[in-house]
Amino acid sequence: MDSNTVSSFQVDCFLWHVRKQVVDQKLGDAPFLDRLRRDQKSLRGRGSTLGLNIEAATHVGKQIVERILKEESDEALKMTMASTPASRYLTDMTIEELSRDWFMLMPKQKVEGPLCIRIDQAIMDKNIMLKANFSVIFDRLETLILLRAFTEEGAIVGEISPLPSLPGHTIEDVKNAIGVLIGGLEWNDNTVRVSKTLQRFAWGSSNENGRPPLTPKQKRKMARTARSKVRRDKMAD
């Protein structure tokens, strides 16, 4: 096992503990609390994958951080903070929408890279909006916290979430997963739109019809799907 992987996990565990203390003292806002909950799941997954105890890792992480802070001068800290770009946290969903439990009548789950896609295949002929909470840096999507698909009535019918055991994903991973989710929902004649905020920071533009640009691979897949649907309809007639 790579030593840097272990030390990174140990430091992340300690920093999560510090952030938890901030929340316990009622000093964190809603996005801060949201990230804390998501990171807790991620740390549990990483701990299981690495075979490391989180409590023990937290103590070692504390020692690493204390050693670094002892060696760090105030001037160096100021320079580091000034040169580090700050990320922003954007929310399409409310805390209630983000934390609400939901279930699927006809569940389908697919893993696309480091992201997990869940779709309720029982949903048909609905207008669906994709909303997401995510962080942005340099005006581009940095990290997806959670994406959910909502009907006009407010029901959750799909979801994209990071896999706790595979931390880290790219903007292309997110766009590919969204393409898979859209394709799965449109298979049952649903009309899917993507929020303008998500379009802007994932694709760099927003369309009035709510549809992001498709990659050549996604276009070919949708064409095959359409041909298959036409053949099924003809056989039914």
Curated annotation (Swiss-Prot):
Residue pairs linked by disulfide bridges in the UniProt entry: none
Entry's localization field: Host nucleus; Host cytoplasm
Modifications the protein undergoes after translation, according to the UniProt entry: Upon interferon induction, ISGylated via host HERC5; this results in the impairment of NS1 interaction with RNA targets due to its inability to form homodimers and to interact with host EIF2AK2/PKR.
A Gene Ontology term for the protein's cellular component: host cell nucleus
One Gene Ontology term from the biological process aspect of the record: symbiont-mediated suppression of host PKR/eIFalpha signaling
The keyword Transcription regulation is annotated on this UniProt entry: no
InterPro entries tied to this protein: NS1 (IPR004208), NS1A (IPR000256), NS1A_effect_dom-like_sf (IPR038064), uS15_NS1_RNA-bd_sf (IPR009068)
Keywords annotated in UniProt: Eukaryotic host gene expression shutoff by virus, Host cytoplasm, Host gene expression shutoff by virus, Host mRNA suppression by virus, Host nucleus, Host-virus interaction, Inhibition of host innate immune response by virus, Inhibition of host interferon signaling pathway by virus, Inhibition of host PKR by virus, Inhibition of host pre-mRNA processing by virus, Inhibition of host RIG-I by virus, Inhibition of host RLR pathway by virus, Interferon antiviral system evasion, RNA-binding, Ubl conjugation, Viral immunoevasion
Residue span of region Disordered: 205-237
Pfam families assigned: Flu_NS1
Region named PABPN1-binding: 223-230
Region (CPSF4-binding): 180-215
Region ranges (RNA-binding and homodimerization): 1-73
Highest taxon of the lineage: Viruses
Motif (Nuclear export signal): 137-146
Keyword RNA-binding: yes
Family that this chain belongs to: Belongs to the influenza A viruses NS1 family.
Oligomer and partners: Homodimer. Interacts with host TRIM25 (via coiled coil); this interaction specifically inhibits TRIM25 multimerization and TRIM25-mediated RIGI CARD ubiquitination. Interacts with human EIF2AK2/PKR, CPSF4, IVNS1ABP and PABPN1.
Function: Inhibits post-transcriptional processing of cellular pre-mRNA, by binding and inhibiting two cellular proteins that are required for the 3'-end processing of cellular pre-mRNAs: the 30 kDa cleavage and polyadenylation specificity factor/CPSF4 and the poly(A)-binding protein 2/PABPN1. In turn, unprocessed 3' end pre-mRNAs accumulate in the host nucleus and are no longer exported to the cytoplasm. Cellular protein synthesis is thereby shut off very early after virus infection.
Protein name per UniProt: Non-structural protein 1
